[in-house]
Amino acid sequence: MQAVKVFEVGPRDGLQNERQPLSVAARVGLIGELAGTGLRHIEAGAFVSPRWVPQMAGSDEVLRQLPSNDGVSYTALVPNRQGFEAAQRAGCREVAVFAAASEAFSRNNINCSIDESFERFTPVLRAANEASIRVRGYVSCVLGCPFSGAVAPEAVAKVARRLYELGCYEISLGDTIGAGRPDETAQLFELCARQLPVAALAGHFHDTWGMAIANVHAALAQGVRTFDSSVAGLGGCPYSPGASGNVATEDLLYLLHGLGYSTGVDLEAVAQVGVRISAQLGTANRSRAGLALAARSAREH
């Protein structure tokens, strides 16, 4: 049975796009619950300005309160050397950096060009290598940009390759606005797999147009075996009106297990976490599988 790695991004990418910020204690509790389901890769926070992203305030406290010997890799997003040093002080052993495949998105999101963004986080890669801290890379807008429209697959592959050559062990290709279709996804990953090992690629799909699970299936067919997901489908994109969150972890697990892949994650346990966090945030549970499991559980009890 082939294994697929599920990378849970709800506590960071999910929560930072929800209107209601959670306390440090609530975020630590959520992460602990997710780890208890068998998830072994969890994005726990971001060392960014609380002025711009108040939902991630106190990420240093969150990281410090997480166990260091439970077999789970807790990752934090860092935009620059300053953020990296803060993550390092908090005991973080894996960080993530992000770039965009679209010049327009890069300028609107982080106020610099793609080349300038690489100048910002190249020192992070250098310092992380010296400290034996792993670095994951994100590429935004791989299947479309909210400002400039279509994005050439060649532009995505170029950015992904640069991240890989700088030392990122894994490159997550993100459909930030959730507009991609399976045919485009297949073409993109086929092209990128010519530039760097497919084992170093991950899929990160938003569900704005209902294509996230279909895109996961298309990426699986191209040999991709790592996918980002968010419990209860938490999240969105502030630059894309109406954008939904990431593909729900529950929906991803339902697909993967049904296709015969092993994940080491308990689907029903994740669904229970999804119900609880949705209620806590006062938001709708966006996971189809999660809602179906909750309805079945209600009937049985």
Curated annotation (Swiss-Prot):
<dbReference type="InterPro" id="IPR000138">
    <property type="entry name" value="HMG_CoA_lyase_AS"/>
</dbReference>
<feature type="binding site">
    <location>
        <position position="204"/>
    </location>
    <ligand>
        <name>a divalent metal cation</name>
    </ligand>
</feature>
<dbReference type="GO" id="GO:0046951">
    <property type="term" value="P:ketone body biosynthetic process"/>
</dbReference>
<feature type="binding site">
    <location>
        <position position="206"/>
    </location>
    <ligand>
        <name>a divalent metal cation</name>
    </ligand>
</feature>
<dbReference type="GO" id="GO:0006552">
    <property type="term" value="P:L-leucine catabolic process"/>
</dbReference>
<dbReference type="InterPro" id="IPR000891">
    <property type="entry name" value="PYR_CT"/>
</dbReference>
<dbReference type="GO" id="GO:0046872">
    <property type="term" value="F:metal ion binding"/>
</dbReference>
<feature type="binding site">
    <location>
        <position position="13"/>
    </location>
    <ligand>
        <name>a divalent metal cation</name>
    </ligand>
</feature>
<dbReference type="GO" id="GO:0004419">
    <property type="term" value="F:hydroxymethylglutaryl-CoA lyase activity"/>
</dbReference>
<dbReference type="InterPro" id="IPR013785">
    <property type="entry name" value="Aldolase_TIM"/>
</dbReference>
<dbReference type="Pfam" id="PF00682">
    <property type="entry name" value="HMGL-like"/>
</dbReference>
<feature type="binding site">
    <location>
        <position position="12"/>
    </location>
    <ligand>
        <name>substrate</name>
    </ligand>
</feature>
<comment type="similarity">
    <text>Belongs to the HMG-CoA lyase family.</text>
</comment>
<comment type="pathway">
    <text>Metabolic intermediate metabolism; (S)-3-hydroxy-3-methylglutaryl-CoA degradation; acetoacetate from (S)-3-hydroxy-3-methylglutaryl-CoA: step 1/1.</text>
</comment>
<comment type="function">
    <text>Involved in the catabolism of branched amino acids such as leucine.</text>
</comment>
<dbReference type="InterPro" id="IPR043594">
    <property type="entry name" value="HMGL"/>
</dbReference>
<feature type="active site">
    <location>
        <position position="237"/>
    </location>
</feature>
<keyword id="KW-0456">Lyase</keyword>
<keyword id="KW-0479">Metal-binding</keyword>
<feature type="domain" description="Pyruvate carboxyltransferase">
    <location>
        <begin position="4"/>
        <end position="271"/>
    </location>
</feature>
<feature type="binding site">
    <location>
        <position position="246"/>
    </location>
    <ligand>
        <name>a divalent metal cation</name>
    </ligand>
</feature>
<protein>
    <recommendedName>
        <fullName>Hydroxymethylglutaryl-CoA lyase</fullName>
        <ecNumber>4.1.3.4</ecNumber>
    </recommendedName>
</protein>
